[in-house]
From Swiss-Prot:
Keywords: Cell cycle, Cell division, Cell shape, Cell wall biogenesis/degradation, Cytoplasm, FAD, Flavoprotein, NADP, Oxidoreductase, Peptidoglycan synthesis. GO terms for cellular component: cytosol. The keyword Membrane does not apply. Residues 29-193 form the FAD-binding PCMH-type domain. Disulfide bonds: none annotated. It catalyses: UDP-N-acetyl-alpha-D-muramate + NADP(+) = UDP-N-acetyl-3-O-(1-carboxyvinyl)-alpha-D-glucosamine + NADPH + H(+). This is UDP-N-acetylenolpyruvoylglucosamine reductase. PROSITE patterns: FAD_PCMH. InterPro entries: FAD-bd_PCMH, FAD-bd_PCMH-like_sf, FAD-bd_PCMH_sub1, FAD-bd_PCMH_sub2, MurB, MurB_C, MurB_C_sf, Oxid_FAD_bind_N. Its cofactor is FAD. The gene is murB. It is an enzyme of class 1 (oxidoreductase).
Length: 299
């Protein structure tokens, strides 16, 4: 399908054509999307998906483009970033957030209503949709422990709901990783708590994160899953890889579990660093480092 064909299909919608994705990814890398959309409502999202389905346009859904690496060749077809779907509501001890709402923002709303259970996520720079997709977690907490249900939109434009038991959560895993359904909202079951203690815990975790993680540089967060019996950062550090650099991408000198863009890094730079780290850790410790970050797009 030509660029002109795509323009005709999506002309009446609020989209961008041939847009550089590096403007929107947390790594500040990534080639062009043929069509890029930021829907303002679930209904608009549904319309975009139906157009793509009807016309066989490839479709890629992103939350807020945080825990992923987009390759330099970009992404063909339609890319939908859900960050404008950010409504958050509270009903008793239940918090419902749309897929594009930030985890940080959702934890703050929960805290404002003296609801506890979500503090662990207060420093995770991702969206609700992405957090469900990969069962995000930190500091001993995981999304699976607080989710009650998730509302999904199928590629056919139909809606369905999964309970937590139906999502097949595991370590950085959910069944959504092998399915095409799109998270549009999630409901969390929390508990009443002491607002002072909730905020103290959130401040404590924010301090820990700022003191240990390289927040001063663009990154995709934690790159590798934690292998059983090991700490990823220690394996990388003990392999002598801290500070290893390709182009503008570097294994962080502050935390060896992070890979950062120190200036004009590319998707290829990221992948070259990742593959080198995997190879060296495998050679030195016979441990396979599996990526946690989502890698998409064309070379």
């Amino acid at each position: 399908m030509t660029t002109n064909d795509l323009r005709e299909l999506f002309l009446d919608l609020n989209v961008k054509f041939d847009e550089e994705l590096k403007k929107y990814t947390n790594t500040k890398t990534g080639g062009k999307a043929d069509v890029l959309a930021f829907p303002d409502s679930i209904e608009e999202t549904e319309k975009l998906i139906k157009i793509a389905k009807k016309n066989n346009v490839p479709l890629t859904i992103l939350g807020n483009a945080s825990n992923l690496i987009v390759k330099d060749g970009g992404i063909r077809g339609l890319v939908v970033i859900l960050q404008h779907l950010d409504q958050i509501t509270v009903d008793g001890t239940k918090v419902t957030a749309q897929a594009g709402a930030s985890l940080i923002g959702t934890t703050r709303v929960a805290a404002k209503h003296s609801l506890t259970g979500m503090e662990f996520a207060s420093g995770i720079p991702g969206s609700i949709g992405g957090a469900i997709f990969m069962n995000a977690g930190a500091y001993g907490g995981e999304i699976k422990n607080i989710v009650e249900s998730v509302k999904l939109l199928t590629r056919d434009g139909e809606y369905k709901t999964y309970t937590v038991d139906e999502l097949d959560f595991g370590y950085r895993h959910s069944r959504l990783q092998s399915e095409d359904d799109i998270v549009v909202a999630a409901t969390f079951k929390l508990e009443h708590g002491d607002i002072k203690k909730i905020r103290e815990r959130m401040e404590e975790l924010s301090f820990l994160r700022a003191s240990k993680q390289p927040l001063e540089y663009p990154s995709c967060g934690s790159v590798f899953k934690r292998p059983a019996g090991h700490f990823t950062g220690k394996l990388v550090y003990d392999s002598g890889l801290q500070g290893y650099t390709v182009g503008g991408v570097q294994v962080s000198k502050k935390h060896a579990g992070f890979i950062v863009n120190i200036g004009n890094g590319t998707g290829k730079d990221y992948l070259d660093v990742i593959h080198h780290v995997q190879a060296v850790v495998k050679e030195k410790f016979d441990v396979e480092l599996e990526t946690e970050v989502r890698i998409i797009g064309e070379d």
